[in-house]
Structure formats: structure tokens, C-alpha cells
Amino acid sequence: MKLCHAIFSTFVVFFVASGAGEKQGESQLQQIYDELSILSRVTNAIALQAAALSKTVKIREVITELLKVDNGNFSNLLSLDPAHLVKNLDELHKKSLQAVSGSNEQLQQDLKEMIAMNGLLAAVESENYTEKATVNSLIVLKKVDEKMEICDESLITIMFNISQAMSGVPFAESDEMKIFSSMKTMKKAFYKCISKFPAFMQKLYEYNYPLSGFLELNDTMNTIKALNELDIANKIPNMLQKFKTPFLNILAVGDHRNKGNTGKLLQSAITLFKKTVYSNSSTRLFLTAGFPESGDMKRVAKDLTSDWFKKKVSRGKSTAELETALKPFNQFAESMAHVFKSWNNFRDDFQTDSALLATIPDLLSQIDDYDRNVDKKKFLENFEATFRTCFKNYKNALDQGEETKFLKNFSAVYLLVRSVQAVEQWASEISTMFDEKAMDVYFEELEKLTPSNIKEQVEKITNFDDFLKIINKFTMLKSLQTQYESAYKTSNSSELSLSKIITDAGLVDTSKCLEKDKLDSSKLLKMLQFMQHMMQLDIDYSTLKANLDNFFELKKKMLETEKLVKGFTSRSARAASNSGSPVLKIKDSQKHADHLGNGLLAIKKMIISLKEKATILKSTMFNAKANQEIREKNPIDYIKEFWTNPGPSIEKLVSDLEKLEQSSKSYRKADLLTIRKVFEDGSKIVGIPEVFSYIDSQFEKKGSQYSNERKITQALSTLDLNFASHKGALSAASLSVDNLKLYFDDLFGLTPKVSVQSESTSPIVVVLICVAIVLVLVILAIVGYGFTSNGRNQYINLYLYYFGKTSDYEKRWRYSLFMDRVDGKNVLIDSVREINATNLLKAVKRGAYINVCNKYGNTALHVATRRGYQNLVEILIKHGADRSFLNPQNKTAEQMIPVNYQETHKEKIERFKSIESIYNKYRKKKFKLCVPEKFPVSSFHIYIEDRTDDNVTNEFTTKFQSITSDEAMITTTHVVVKTTEDGILETDDLNLLIWIFHGSIIVRDTWMVDCLRDEKLIEKDCDYLVEKVKYKGIIYDTVTQWSNAMAKATTPFLYGVHVALCMKNCPYLASLTAIIQGQGGTMLDKFPDKDAFNKGSHPYLHKNLGPIFLLHDGTGDLDLYRSDPDKMFTLFTEQQFMDLLFKREINKDTNPKIIPVLVDEED
């Protein structure tokens, strides 16, 4: 028996021992994560303690990172000192308690009822009942037509049939042929219909104005009913008598209190609370990566004595010295526990009470602003007396039959009013959609249709979808006309009038009396609201006070913790310098803590993903319709591409995670250097790009259509499956484990001592080795320099200078508009203007675009030659300035030397002779252009237009915060715009289009999406350029032409153009002015005098046009200028002018003797 018991005991001990190290239910990878987290926490504690000893710790940043709040907002919060605010609030609350102590729920209810009745009084005061009594629908309806026709019924029928056919309604083949053939013949009827629109719109306005007055009659009727139902004629005087004493007690609080700004102070405090609570910090941990959870810091003390740490790190050696060194950190951890608790209380209570708290500042502001100079008692007595006098003529009786008759007739007239408004809205929408030029294009295309496959031909017409929208809109007209005619017949026999009801009630005399005796219901309203606010403050104060107390407690614990850490830096530093603290022995402890902590966070994401592997695999089994929806309609290109065949990538992800789990089992049993291989294996897992959050958003918009698939995408949308983005963190973590092992081995005396033996070496060998080392070092230095950013750029520039193509230069010249400007001025033009050879030489050597033009179309070489700056001329020629470039006078730079300078410029004779010799000297020589500097990403100023996806925009601005702005600025380099799937910018907004003519680089919104996936693509803006713009239904492909022209500052497109506006209203005046002036034109502030311009002159780049541009809206008579015999005027509508700009067609005046535009223009 004893033998059996011994055998059984031995078996139990063995079983328990063999399973002691395994945590049931946890994966091997999870257990490695838990164990390495011990090392991560200890390392982070050492790093923070070392920073405290060396006085480099940024304790506020450490705490805010632990709390996961924004450091700036939190610091602003702690700087808040609301002591004065609390004092005012306590004082006000005390007075409010005294004032409302005798009040009850009935008083609060009566206050609400008084406010409602006071609103009716205000309506009676302001209403003109004499006028309302004269309104009669039969009189108005005599002026309204029985029918409302604008288009021929045959045209509406054609459009209805086209709409049905295009939407897929089946027709016989012969009928369908007739339907589409009829499109070719409807042009005349369509334009006839459209021509009637101005008169039709005017008629609608004439109908709608008097008819809408009937709606006001209903409001008047509702007021009369309310006056009767509330019985205010008797109730108001009685209530004023009954509650005068408690009212005056409450109102007295305002009289005995100085006017303050309590509401504004509280609003500022709550705004800071809200910013701090609701704005999260960056998810990337830098100082506390070892403590991802709130309780992790307190675990460090136990980590040092844990079995795993003793076995894998200290390997049985005493940890007492390290425990002693980290005692101050443990005190910090204890103090932080109180901070966490205070923060959680503050955050949770504020989130619960935020809606209520948001209403209190306004309530307090109204109390602060209350008028204390009114004699309340006298006012209430006068109010009651005036009310009784005026309402003695009022009869509180409403005839039931009259009311029923009114409501019946109102329903009939109301249908007519709504019918007219519906037609008016339809006409307004059609007018907005209609574009004459685009319609001409559609009808031209329709006339080309042939009988065979006519529907397919129609569908291929460019932008036919826009035409179809107009057709669909017209199909609504028939039903709108029918509704109108039906409503007219019903209402035409219905007399709508309030004359008898108003007369019977005596409202005319009552309202006149109220107006004459100045009842002043608005002042009573302010008093009633003040009383309401005081009573409400008594209810809300406890919530407000609790939140303020939470804040004070949080601030107290924060300051105590910061003071504790500052104490460590003063006392501990002296002790550490004498004893040699072990926490100071490791180099870059903070870096290792950062790398190891963030590497483990990446492992944690893999663990979470591994738990969801079944759900991940289900995503490969979506039905065909859902897959097609993603491939064809997801707004993000890379997701469409990925979902063409997502299965292999997703299955490989799951397979890689399972392999990592399998290898973790063997790693756990080995030493630290073997365990770290989990990071190396993890870094090889690529994963998949972020797709599920975007797909989930796509499915969410479809309602229940993809409910089964959405359960999967919802579950996966929170997972980070793009493990390739964590490769750097995992690799860094692996290297940090190596360094940490060396540190701990040295700390615990585990490093083996190496014996050193001396050997004699030949001096010749030593010399040869030294020479070889020097040569190797020189070669390595040259090669190594090439791996630095400066070296790489310099080597690339050398290559481009000797072997580069024009296209290579063009890629960099795209940024010349921004690279070559200082304080908004081009550095070349400015250097010549200032005669600054030093700055000019610096600019050309760093590759500034050398043929840039000033606003007069002259290059720097033209200006330098014209002014006789021979040293500047030589610098420009020797650095590749184009000597054949023609300015707007069709002169080369050399031709800018005055012909008779010996007579006209005697003081510059030597200068011009020197310049002539320079041109002769280098006439047959060509010079290379210097390589333009690469425009750094850090100098990007990116502005994102409002129509882009809000989620993508917010993520992008967060990720690239330093180079993005939510404000448009003169320094903006890139403008991200919403484009179609074809990459076309569609907009009629000149405030957005102005960026094209400003010279900013216009990029598609898909750039943001791809940059979020791979931030290196921020440098590849050239792959996302917008090349086409659709304005007023027409597509133009000159966007990049404008960018390049502005980058190189070519001859201004509108040089010699003088613009005058002939419009009653120009909503885009500021944008048009900026475009015109930016392109070298002149915006005139008054109508031009033709005599000030030379006959026969033209803008330099538009010899086919007159120099005076008149922009008009088509309303004025401009035939005199249109038929000008001298062809000095060119007339444009705003759209035609933009068409000129977008086409960017140039007709250069090649005449060697250009006629100046202005009579007094200088050469």
C-alpha cells in the first residue's frame, strides 16, 4: 500500500512539474510576449530612472504618454487655475439656494407656462390684424392661371420615353428605334422651351409671393386657438398676483450681484476639459513603450524577482543592487497609480456629464448679463395693469364652425401653394443644370447617330450622363403640371379668410392697445428666463462641482508626482555619482526600451490577429456580388487591385502567423538570444494592406445588403494586418535584445574574462597594414558618404550634370516656383534688380531656373543687359542663360543694348562696350545649366480641398502634420483635390480653380490613400498629378501645362491684356482679379478710355484678340464694343474667359516691331 502511494505521489509531482511552466489556454506566442514584457518593463524602468539621474527626464511628456493624452492640451489644462471661478460659482449658488428655497415644482411649471403665454403676447403685439382681416384667397386666385404650361407635351413625351429606355424598361425593337431617333429632332422644341424660362420664372415669383401669404394665415389661426386654449386673458393677471413675491425674491439675487464673466470663464475651462479628454495622443509610444497598460509600472518590482527574470536574465545572480537602484522608480509608479485613478475619474465623469456641462456656461452668461437697473416691482405692476386694460375688449370664444371652415379651405389652398413651390424649385434646378455650350455639343452628337445600334451610340456620347440627368428632370414636369391643375380646381372654389374670426375675437382693438401702451413682453421674457436659470443652476450645480473637484484632485496628484520626480534628480544624482548606479551603465537605455517595447506591441498585434484567423479566412469566402462590389465600386484604387485576388495573400498571412506560433514553442525553452528570434521571424511576415476598415465603410452605406459580409469586415476593421509596416520595429527589437543581454551579463557578472597574449609584429607589416587601412578608410569614406543624404544628393547631381537628360531637369524645375523664391520674390530677378552678383552666383550655381521672366516678360539676362550690368550678364551667360529668348517686344537679350547708347547713355558707354564684348566672346560657346537642387519633402506645404474623404484627410494630416495645413496660403506647394475615377478634377468653383493658375502642383486624392499605406510615396507626387479639369461640362487637359509654365515663370499669359467688368454681380471677383493679375494682366477699376490704347495693338500672346477684355454677364447692351471698327475690344462671359485660360492657346505676335498696347507705354 505504501509503495503504491509513493508511486502515485511521484507521478503527481512529475505531472505538476512538467506543466508548471505552461499557462493553460494561452498560445506559445502569447507566453513569449508575456515573458519578454518583463524584460521590456525592467528596461523602460532603467531608462526612466537613468534619465532622472542625468536630469534629462521630461516628466510631463512621460506622464501624458502613459495617460495617452495630448501633451499640449494636458499642459494647458494643468495651467488652468479656476479658483476665482469656483469662488464666484459658490457665491452664486449660495444666493440661488436662498432665493429658491421656498419654491417648488409648481412654481417651475408655472414659469414654463408663463414663458409660453408671453410668446403668444409677443405674437399679438407684432401682428397687424387689420391687414390679416382683409386677406381673401378668392381675390388672389383671380390673378393665377388655371394651367401652367412651359414645354410642348410632345417634347415631354419624348423625354419620358428616353428616360424609360435608358433605365432599362423593355421596349419592342422598332419602338426603341423610334424613341432614340426622336432625340435627333427634339433640339428646336427643347430650345423653344428653354427660351420661355425667364418669363416663366418671373410668373412663378409673382404667383408664389401672394400665395405664400396664406401660410401666414394659418400661423395667425394657431395663435388665436392658443390664446383661447391657454385662457391667457384670465391666467396671466392671476399668476402675476399669485407669484409676485417669489418672483421678486429670485430677481433680487441679480440686483445684489455685480456683473461678472463667470459664464465665459467656465466656458474656457470646459473647452480645455473637452480638448484634453477627447483628443488622443499619437498611438506610437516613445518614452513608455514598455508600459502599454496602466498597471504595468507597478509590476517592475515583482518582475525583478520573477522566476523568468532569474532564469533567463540574471541567471541566479542577486538582483538586490538593481532593485535598490530602482526604488525611486517604484515610488514614481505608486504615485502614478494615484494619477491614473484621478485621471480616470475626471475623464469618465466628464464624458458622462459633458452634454449637461456644455449648457451651464450659457446659462451663467445669461445670468451675468441680466439687467440690474430695472425696477422689477414697478414693471410687474405696470405690466399687469396694461394687460388688463388691453384685454378687456378680447373675447375668449372661437366659433367651431368658422374654425372647421377655415381649416378645410386652408388645406385646399395649401396644396396649390406647395404645387407652385414645387414647380419653382424644379425650374430653378433645371436652370442650374443647363449649359448652352454643352447642350450644343450633345445635339451635334445626336445628329450624327446612325440607325444601327443607336442605343449603344447614345451611351458612348461624351458626358451623356449629364444630358440624361436633364432629361430625367424634364420627365417630372408632366406630373407637376397635373398636380398644379388639380390643386387650382380645388382651391378656386375655396374662400380662405380670417376676417370674421378676428373681428369676433376683438383682436384688432387688443393688438392696437398693446402696441400703443408698450406692454414690452420682451423685458418680461428676460425676467422669466433669469428666474428659470437660477432655479436650473440649483439643479445642475452638484454635477458641475463634482467635475471641478475631479479636476482639482487630478491637478494635485499630477503636481505631487512631478515634484516627487524632481526630488529624485536633486537627491539621487549625488548619491548615484558616488555609488555608480547600475542604471547608468547601459548606453542608450531609452532607445532600447523604445525598440523592445514597440517590437512587442507589433507581436501583440500578431497575437490578436492569430486569435481571429478563422474570421480572417472567412473574408476569402464572400459571395460573388460582394466581391464584385469591392472590385468595382470601392473608392480606393489599391483596394480594388488587391481584391482582384485576395485569397492567396490572406491565406499566406494566416499560414505565416501559424508558423510563428509553432516556432515560438521551441524558442521559449532556449536562452534570451534564441528567444529574440521571434522578432526576426515576425519581421518576415508581410501581412496585407489596410483594406477591411475601408470595405466595412463601403458595406455600411449599403444597409443590410451585405449584412453577413459586414459582420466579418466589422470584426477585422480594428485589426492591424499590415505587418510589413512593423518590420523596422521588429528588427530594432531583435538588436536591442542583443545589447540588453550584454548589459545584464555585465551587470550580473556573467561576462567571461578574456586572457590577452602579446605577440611581436614586424614594423614593415605594421606600416603596410596602416597604409592598407588608410586606403580602405578613404574608399569607405567615399562610399559611405554616398549613403548619406547629402552624399547621395551630391553624387546624383554630378551624374545629372554630365549625363542627365532634359527630362531629368524638368522633374526638378517643376518646383522652381517654390525653390527659387525668397519672401515671395524670384531670387534671380531680385538679384539683378539689386545688382547683387554674389546672390545671383549662388542662385545659378544651385540650379535656379535661369530663363525665368518678370511680369513684363523679360528674363534676368534681358534686364541685366538693358541696365548695363556687365558682371551680371557674364554670370548669366556662363551658366546657360538662353541668349535667343524673345521678350514681348520680340527682342533677344543682346538686342536690349540701346542702338545709339554713345548718344543716349553717355554715362554707360564703357559698360555697354563691355557687354558687347562679352556677347561676342561667348557667341559660339554653349554652357551647361547647373543641376537644380532637389525640392525636399520637408518644404512641402500641402492644402487639401473640402470635398475629399474626411477620414482619409484626417489620417493624412495626422501622419504628415508638419507639411499639411487646413488653410490655403500663398506658400502652398500642393493642392490635393477630389477627382473622378479617371483622375479628372470636376468643379465650377473658381476659388478652387485659382490654384491651377497660381502654379501649385495639383494632385489626386488617391495620393493621400497610397501615402497612408506607404509613406515613402509622399515623394512620388509626380505619379498623382491631375492632368485634366472639367469646368462647366467641358474637359480641358492643360493643368500640367499651367503648372510647368508657372514653375518656369514663362512670358505671362495675359501680358498686355486690360480687363474691365461689365457685370451687376460678380461672385468670384476676388478670384478673377487674382488670376488676371497673376498672369500679367491689368484689372481696371473704371471703364477704359479707348484713346489711351494704340490702334492695331494686341496682347503679345494673343495677336487675334483686342487688348481690352470686357467680361460681361449677358445682361447689358455691348453691341457698340462688339462691333468696334478698330477691334480694340474682346468680349467674354466669365465662362468664355475661363475657356480661353483653360485652352491655353497661344497666338504669338511675331512682328519684329510690336505696337505697344498703351499710348504712353515705355519700351
UniProtKB/Swiss-Prot annotation:
Residues 929-1025 form the BRCT domain. Gene3D superfamilies: Ankyrin repeat-containing domain, BRCT domain. The keyword Ion transport does not apply. The keyword Isomerase does not apply. SMART domains: ANK (SM00248), BRCT (SM00292), WSN (SM00453). InterPro entries: Ankyrin_repeat-containing, Ankyrin_rpt, Ankyrin_rpt-contain_sf, BRCT_dom, BRCT_dom_sf, WSN. Coiled coil: none annotated. ANK repeats lie at residues 856-885. Keywords: ANK repeat, Repeat. PANTHER family: ANKYRIN REPEAT-CONTAINING PROTEIN F37A4.4-RELATED (PTHR22956:SF17), ANKYRIN REPEAT-CONTAINING PROTEIN F37A4.4-RELATED-RELATED (PTHR22956). This is Ankyrin repeat-containing protein F37A4.4.
